[in-house]
Amino acid sequence: MNGGDDIIHQAVRLKIMAALNAMMPKAAAIDFTRLKALVGTTDGNLGAHLETLQKAGYIQVEKRFQDRKPQTLVRMSPAGRRAFSDHVAYLREIIDSADR
């Protein structure tokens, strides 16, 4: 059994990565406000977790203006997709071994 990813394993970050993964390939990115609603957290908490994921290279954050309003878009990077997939496989191994 391979080890899990300590960065992704934290509950809020796991929800973020799951939400981003679920959006693929339908949407290239998720708006910060929508992601906050999906994850069920505050602006500050989401921002801190996004920073951790971005530093790990798991997500890309794009800040831009739309209709003169700031907009933050978040997308999963290829490295993030691989890390999330590996972590899901790790969790499945744990669950499968518990069912035996």
Language-model regions, residue ranges each:
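Histidine-centered active-site/metal-ligand motif
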Residues: 9, 49, 87
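Structural motif
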Residues: 11-14, 56, 71
